[in-house]
Amino acid sequence: MYAVIKTGGKQYRVAAGEKIKVEQIPADVGSEITIDQVFMVGEGESVKIGTPVVSGATVTATVVSHGRHDKIKIFKMRRRKHYQKHQGHRQNYTELRIEAISA
């Protein structure tokens, strides 16, 4: 069984037992969260598509850890003007383990 969920402004295709990294969620490590924005649930040949969400469908996940992604480098330059700008960014994330999908 799999589902398409929305969290942190992004959509993820998840299945039970998977680990995913999502935008940071304010929850303690080891706590269980419930995601109710489920857009699609599928099992074998049967697929339920919501308008926009599947009513009564939830995904239960456990917070595994919090962390930060690798640093990305931003470099801006204007040629012949001696203008260069360096910047870096590290995005925070929360790692979730999908426990169950109920539809």
Swiss-Prot record:
Keywords: Ribonucleoprotein, Ribosomal protein, RNA-binding, rRNA-binding. It holds the Pfam family Ribosomal_L21p. GO terms for cellular component: cytoplasm; ribonucleoprotein complex; ribosome. GO terms for molecular function: rRNA binding; structural constituent of ribosome. The keyword RNA-binding applies. PROSITE patterns: RIBOSOMAL_L21 (PS01169). GO terms for biological process: translation. The keyword Aminoacyl-tRNA synthetase does not apply. InterPro entries: bL21-like, bL21-like_sf, Ribosomal_bL21, Ribosomal_bL21_CS. Part of the 50S ribosomal subunit. Contacts protein L20. NCBIfam families: L21. This protein binds to 23S rRNA in the presence of protein L20. HAMAP family: Ribosomal_bL21 (MF_01363). Belongs to the bacterial ribosomal protein bL21 family. This is Large ribosomal subunit protein bL21.
